[in-house]
Amino acid sequence: MDIIEKIKDTREAKGLSRYKLSQLTGIHESTLKRYEDRAIKKISFENLLKICEALEINIKEII
């Protein structure tokens, strides 16, 4: 399982929509969708940290 899959699985397991995650992170919802759809191949470290914080997970859990 790769980083994007882990993020999506965790987001869904916590019952968060992409819209809500967008609100929590400040990352535009369309950017989150493009990450999950793999339209954007690489996620910035800064955005990865924001997502992990919003999902309340340690970055070590997904990398």
Regions found by a protein language model. Name each.
Residues 27-42:
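Recognition helix of helix-turn-helix/homeodomain-like DNA-binding domains
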Residues 5, 29, 44-48:
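Short alpha-helical elements of helix-turn-helix
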Residues 46-61:
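DNA major-groove recognition helix of helix-turn-helix/homeodomain DNA-binding modules
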Residues 8-12, 36, 58:
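A broad helix-preferring feature
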Residues 5-24:
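Short basic helix-loop element that most often maps to the first helix and adjoining turn
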Residues 1-2:
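A detector for short, charged/polar N-terminal pre-domain segments
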Residues 7, 21, 32-35, 62:
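Conserved hydrophobic/aromatic packing and binding residues within compact polymer-binding modules
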